[in-house]
Curated annotation (Swiss-Prot):
GO cellular component, one term: ribosome
HAMAP family from the UniProt entry: Ribosomal_bL36 (MF_00251)
This protein's encoding gene: rpl36
Main location (coarse class): plastid
Species this protein is from: Emiliania huxleyi (Coccolithophore)
Protein name per UniProt: Large ribosomal subunit protein bL36c
Sorted UniProt keywords: Chloroplast, Plastid, Ribonucleoprotein, Ribosomal protein
Length: 48
């Protein structure tokens, strides 16, 4: 899975791609071609 700063242009890669929001992050998933998986948003730092 790749991490990108913007998935706006990547939405149109395939007709099966869909944008999903999970736990504050935005994911682009594709059932027909799993190589196209993308995540937007970086990991948050945990407080000690």
């Amino acid at each position: 899975m790749k991490v990108v700063s913007s998935i706006g242009s990547l939405k149109k890669r395939s007709k099966d791609c869909q944008v999903v929001k999970r736990r504050g992050r935005i994911y682009l998933i594709c059932k027909s071609d799993p190589r196209l998986k993308v995540r937007q948003g970086r990991a948050k730092m945990k407080r000690k």
